A protein has these predicted regions:
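Phosphate-coordination loops involved in phosphoryl transfer and adenosine-cofactor binding
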Residues: 1-3, 92, 153-156, 215
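Beta1-alpha1 glycine-rich phosphate/pyrophosphate-binding loop at the start
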Residues: 2, 9-87, 167-195, 264-265
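Short hydrophobic core segments
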Residues: 5-7, 114-126, 160, 238-247
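A Rossmann-like FAD-binding core segment of flavoenzymes
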Residues: 86, 90-99, 107, 113-115, ...
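Glycine-rich dinucleotide-binding loop and its adjacent helix/turn
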Residues: 123-176, 266-275
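FAD-site-proximal beta/loop scaffold in flavoenzymes
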Residues: 137-151, 248-298
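A conserved FAD-binding loop/helix module that cradles the flavin
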Residues: 288-318
Length: 318
């Protein structure tokens, strides 16, 4: 039986594994995807907002070419962290069920089962996109993740969303030769759009280089076109790809199945003790961005790295 199983092999999950090892705990880090799966799914040319030192874990220095590292450098860094600490990892193994036992918990996965005294959920949010729930969303042309602009050259691309991701995708695909239309539920772009980018997208929309439908939603998607509802009524647009940058959310289903409760607030914030990170279920802890519920801009790598030590000290002290 493990002392602790950490679900999620992102930066905070790895930090938890490191702190568990330092505390002398018998631990396992398990993830349904690859190492730092969320970072792997970032756009290929993405640069972090944070400087490299703020992304460091486990006393392993993060040296990047620029002041702020890119995706490639981050993947290299976290591989180096996992290797240098020889972390006990099981990747590409999805947890399908968690049951309480007399001594703790049993985690059932696609490959087997593991017994543990405690659990840390460090599952982040990037693996679970908000779905539009419209006919045709399951077509191959619909993407909830964006990697690079090249495939969209010369294509009619519909970008859904009003926040930073949607704006970045619209501008980048437009500049690489796509015919871009934005579909935005809100009456305007969100105030959270980066201040140095907002004038660019507003000017492109104003001049007509990028078309934008505000107060509008996608109704149905077909192979070569998409229906949208606008304030002026329904419209059918020719379309090759839909890039749904609608945001992401934590895996609430997993938390609820484990008995974790939630506050009655707009962010569906999970219940946990901020001093120990322990949830309302004794023996189950939260770490990282998952702590914020739907407020996914509250916790980042740089301000939640400390969760790992707090959790492991709480577990060690019983």
């Amino acid at each position: 039986m493990y002392d602790v199983i950490i679900i999620g092999a992102g930066p905070i999950g790895l930090a938890c594994g490191i702190e568990a090892k330092k505390a002398g705990l018998d631990y396992l880090v398990i993830d349904k995807g690859c190492l730092v799966n969320s970072i792997y799914n970032y756009p290929l040319n993405m640069t972090f907002f944070s400087t490299s030192d703020r992304l460091e874990i486990g006393e392993v220095p993060f040296i990047s070419h620029g002041n702020k590292p890119n995706r490639f450098e981050a993947l290299e860094y976290y591989r180096r962290v996992a290797s240098s600490w020889a972390l006990n990892l099981k990747l590409y193994e999805k947890v399908t069920q968690v049951d309480q036992t007399g001594e703790g918990f049993r985690l059932v996965t696609e490959r087997g089962a593991y017994d543990t005294k405690t659990i840390v959920l460090a599952t982040g949010f990037y693996d679970y996109p908000y779905m539009m729930n419209v006919p045709g969303e399951d077509l191959p042309k619909v993407k909830h993740y964006y990697d690079e602009p090249h495939p969209y050259f010369g294509q009619k691309v519909m970008v859904v969303g009003a926040a930073n991701s949607a704006v970045d995708v619209a501008l980048e695909t437009y500049r690489k030769g796509a015919d871009v239309t934005m579909v935005i539920r809100e009456p305007a772009l969100l105030d959270s759009v980066k201040y140095w980018v907002k004038p660019d997208i507003e000017n492109r929309i104003k001049e007509g280089s990028i078309k934008a439908y505000f107060n509008s939603e996608i109704v149905e998607i077909r192979k070569y076109e998409a229906d949208i509802m606008t304030p002026e009524g329904p419209k059918t647009l020719q379309n090759d790809f839909v890039l749904a940058m609608t945001g992401y959310k934590p895996n609430f289903d997993l938390m609820q199945s484990m008995g974790i409760g939630f506050h009655d607030d707009e962010f569906h914030t999970p219940i946990f003790n901020a001093d120990t990170q322990q949830t309302n279920v004794e023996g189950i802890y939260l770490a990282g961005v998952v702590c914020g519920g739907l407020k996914t801009n509250k916790w980042f790598i740089e301000n939640s790295r400390t969760h790992a030590e707090v959790v492991m000290q709480s577990i060690k002290n019983g």
